[in-house]
Structures are given as C-alpha cells and as structure tokens.
C-alpha cells in the first residue's frame, strides 16, 4: 500500500463535543463501501504519555488538556508508518490508572484513518499529515454536561473531581489551545456529532480523495 492510498481525516474539538459520534458514524457507513479492514479510528487519548513512574497522586495532578500531556511525536510517527504501508502498535491508556497499560493494539495499514482528539489541530506535524481536518464547534456548556455524565458513568470519576478538573484545566486549556486551533480546520461542524449534512460532506470528501 502506498501513501496515496491512505487518507487521514482529523476530527478535533472540545471534550464531549461529538467527535467520537461523528467518527463512529463515518466509520460504520464507510465500512459498507470499503470493508471493515480498510478503515480505522485512532483516538488521540491513546497517546497520553506513560506515567507509570509517577505516584497516583502525581498522575491525578497532570494537566491532561495541555498539548505537552500527549506524545504527538509518536502519533505522527505512527501515521507516517501507516501511510508507508507499515503496521503500528498503538498504546492503550487507562483512564482509571491515569497511565498507559502494557497492552498495545496492532493496526494494519488502511485506506482511511480517522483521528479524533481535542488537541490534534494544535500540532503542525499532525496537521501536515491530514488530508482533511474537522473542528466540532459545540457550545462549551453542552460539552461540560456531556463530559460530566460520561466521566462519572464510564470512567470511574466522581462528580466533584470532574467539576474540579473542568474549572482547573479543561475550560482554561480549551480557551488557550483548542478553540484557537479551529482556524486550521477545513470543515467546522456546529450542533455536534448528529449533524447529518456535515457527515455527508465529510464522507463525500473522503470518497473524492480515495478516487484520486
């Protein structure tokens, strides 16, 4: 597989803005056309730095909404390898342990790779590897309510810890890094991941790139 056959789409935006939903929708619908082995999804969260050398107390203090919390260099390297037709071993991150675990996920080269993550568009190397980029422009108060529900139900968090983190890092980092990165997006999607018109436009763009 050569580099022209690997289309990389980046979907960025605030936490709980609808990135995963639109990525899942596109994945499922393109699978019907391309086959399940030809499209994959990579979550930026998998590339949080390994913190196994830190105590749990110190891990909890990490600012996970700052670009420095993520190993974007490794992610860029993996994307380059996939474009070159080489498989990669994607890290697995534990939200309850606040670090990587020993397991990895092997991804084979794909025709389409969908990236999703809050800080993808802040990194020039990642932007250069993308064939198209998307920013989910969902109101921050809606994102917060969704995040609160998700993190308590799915990630073993307490309501108090989610609210504290939102005040301490999530909102400030959104304003400092995530929202300004919107300027780099090719497509800005309002109203969250259920925006059908935006989904169809993005699918059409992917199909156009594949046809080149």
UniProtKB/Swiss-Prot annotation:
It is an enzyme of class 2 (transferase). It holds the Pfam family PRK. GO terms for cellular component: cytoplasm. Its main location: cytoplasm. ATP binds at residues 13-20. It is found in: Cytoplasm. One of its GO terms (molecular function) is cytidine kinase activity. It catalyses: uridine + ATP = UMP + ADP + H(+); cytidine + ATP = CMP + ADP + H(+). Its EC number is 2.7.1.48. Keywords: ATP-binding, Cytoplasm, Kinase, Nucleotide-binding, Transferase. Pathway: Pyrimidine metabolism; CTP biosynthesis via salvage pathway; CTP from cytidine: step 1/3; Pyrimidine metabolism; UMP biosynthesis via salvage pathway; UMP from uridine: step 1/1. One of its GO terms (biological process) is CTP salvage. Belongs to the uridine kinase family. HAMAP family: Uridine_kinase (MF_00551). This is Uridine kinase.
């Amino acid at each position: 597989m050569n580099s022209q056959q690997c289309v990389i789409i980046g979907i960025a935006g605030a936490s709980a803005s609808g990135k995963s939903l639109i990525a899942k929708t596109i994945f499922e619908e393109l699978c019907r056309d391309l086959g399940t082995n030809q499209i994959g999804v990579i979550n930026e969260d998998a590339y949080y730095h390994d913190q196994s050398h830190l105590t749990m107390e110190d891990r909890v203090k990490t600012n996970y909404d700052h670009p420095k919390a993520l190993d974007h260099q490794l992610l860029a390297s993996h994307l380059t390898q996939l474009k070159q037709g080489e498989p990669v071993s994607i890290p697995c991150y534990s939200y309850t342990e606040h670090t990587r675990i020993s397991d990895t996920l092997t991804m084979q080269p794909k025709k389409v790779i969908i990236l999703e993550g809050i800080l993808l568009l802040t990194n020039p190397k990642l932007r250069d590897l993308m064939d198209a980029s998307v920013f989910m422009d969902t109101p921050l108060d809606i994102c917060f309510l969704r995040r609160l529900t998700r993190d308590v139900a799915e990630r073993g968090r307490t309501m108090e810890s989610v609210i504290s983190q939102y005040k301490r890092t999530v909102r400030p980092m959104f304003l400092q890094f995530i929202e300004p990165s919107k300027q780099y997006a090719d497509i800005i999607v309002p109203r969250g991941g259920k925006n059908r018109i935006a989904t169809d436009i993005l699918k059409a763009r992917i199909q156009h790139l594949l046809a080149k």
